[in-house]
Amino acid sequence: MRQLASFLLLLCPLGAIAQTIDSDTTQTIKEVVVNGFRISGNVLASSPVQTLSHADMERLGIRDMGDALKRFAGVQVKDYGGVGGMKTVNIRGLGAGHTGVVYDGVQVGDCQSGQVDLSRFTLDNISLISLQIGQDDNIYQSAKSYASAGMINISTLQGYTDRNSQSTRKKTQLATTIRTGSYGLFSPSLLFHQQFSRLGIGAYGSYERADGVYAFKLKNGVKTINERRNNSDIETWRGEINLDYQLSDKQILKWKAYGFTSHRGLPGAVIYDNTYSAERLVDKNVFTQLFYENQFSQRIKLKAAAKWNYSWSRYSDVPASGYKEDIYRQQEAYLTATLWSEPLQGLHLSLAQDYAHNHLSMSLSQAANPTRNSLWTALAANYRIGQFTFNTSLLATNITEHVKIGNASDGFHRLSPAFSLQWRALQDLRLRFGYKDIFRTPTLNELYYTGIGNRHLNPEKSRQWNLGATYSHTFNRTLQLSLTADGYFGNVTDKIIAVPKMFYWQMMNAGKVRQIGLDISANAEQRWSNDWSLSVTGSYSMLNATDRTNPTDVFYGDQIAYTPRHSGSASALLHTPWMDLSYNMLLMGERYSLGYSIPQNRMTGFTDHSVTLSKNFRILKQQLRLQLDVRNLGNKNYEVVRFYPMPGTNWRLSVSWKL
């Protein structure tokens, strides 16, 4: 495989201003900009962590959250195609249920499916996306943050930033973007931030619509038929209001309100003799969260948050038997508090306590309409001595449930340990080792969904080991090279899968999976001046995730479904005085649509190539930005999910204005 090795990304340079003051007299001199580099967080961390800033995503032409996460090593994004297709994230073959999402410091949950659809988030107001695998170096976090094998952290913009992701520090900031493109895309957005002495007020709103109709080729044996993808339209509204109030020099209070509404068609799987689909999905989500932090001293601090979340969704279809409609409602109340202290030099301790109350109601007949109460308690420590950094944590989980109809599960109670160790062997070389024992609680659908739910399910258990090395060096102050490599081993037991019975399917603990893999990332950046630079980035993942359930099964040892053995990405960004030019490539190797590795289930690999051109203009102290993105230059209708063809070559034009 010629395409297995690649290189990884983009570090944002830091500008430093040097000033000189004469010892006898004061003189005013011009600013001198010194080119420098910021070391990637992945290089310094004791467990794998990868990040993308707002400036990175903008210049690379990254369109949505799924597109951003595809560039991280060890990540598979399940994309159902179309402009508004659902997107979930699978880390190292564990399944989307093992991936947590934190939005501005507070966990995002979905007790019904256990998976967060990342298509509901837009990138216009995102300042940073990070992916943490295993034990986090940051122990100043909520207890629930320890409850996932991997964590996606999303931070929103508080006002806008410059091309180096630095705040512009203006009191009044206003930015608007209008996008248009293929498939009837039209998407305006508005970002506002006003800073007073102690109070900050921010607002963000966006609208997106697209008809989603695109051509694709349908093959049946030797015949190829030209078809059009229909029922892939989408109309989405998003809005946020943020208030930040500095109570004192040591205390801050933050409040956020979020609203989301989406109406979209579900195009369904492509069937040779019937490409029609009438499935529709309406999603509505509202949440509000309050955050408080008090830094009592340099050695002790406390933060707490409260959140209320309401989600409503309606699925409808018109099958041969007549109109069908299902309505689901979720409500969540969530509380968290974390105390951090430094009792000794180099030793940090934290204690976190979280509580969540979830209720799910369904319009299905004989629906259980369950309620879940969850408690998480986490004790963590971080110790640094010499060239060593050690992190450890212990999470206690206690979950109880009750239902309106039938019998509830017995609940779930478990201790989950984790640790990581980093050794700085040389000035530029670090070695790291980590272990995490975690479990996934069965979702309310898996436990109580009418007809297939199983109240006797056990948690899905995961044990993960990681051994890696990182290297970063700057040559002649103009060239920086960063490399990371992580090998890992893991196993999943009591895997929850749907098992066929005599006349129906039922969720069962009937699976075991073993994972052996390697993640490599690399970044090289050459800076000749402020106006000229070149960044080359790449990532490569090898993953052997095989079924280890029953040695007598014919598919024992086969690769699990939708998990390629080889995947990767590469990017190159050239910054010039006239414009920025970027090239991106995504590689997905061969995989299987079912856990039985036979030719009928094989899905061929593909590469997706894209380019982005962007230009900034200064007009009357205001900034205007034009950007053109062209995706899928090969015009291939490849499939990420079987029978869900992706669009061919498509384009997007963006115009942004900042006051």
Regions picked out by a protein language model, each given a short descriptive name:
Residues 488, 587-594, 602, 610-659:
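C-terminal beta-signal and adjacent terminal beta-strands/loops
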Residues 248, 344-354, 358-359, 363-490, ...:
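Structural signature of Gram-negative outer-membrane beta-barrels, strongest in the C-terminal barrel
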Residues 66, 70-107:
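Extracytoplasmic beta-strand/coil segments of soluble accessory domains associated
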Residues 120-175:
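A beta-strand signature from Gram-negative outer-membrane beta-barrel systems
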Residues 19-58, 66, 96:
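Short, acidic, small-residue-rich periplasmic hinge/interaction motif at the N-terminus
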Residues 345, 483-491, 509-594, 621-623, ...:
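Gram-negative outer-membrane beta-barrel transporters
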Residues 303-315, 431-432, 460-516, 521-525, ...:
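Membrane-embedded beta-barrel scaffold of Gram-negative outer-membrane proteins
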Residues 210, 214, 226-236, 246-332, ...:
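Flexible loop and strand-edge segments within Gram-negative outer membrane beta-barrel domains
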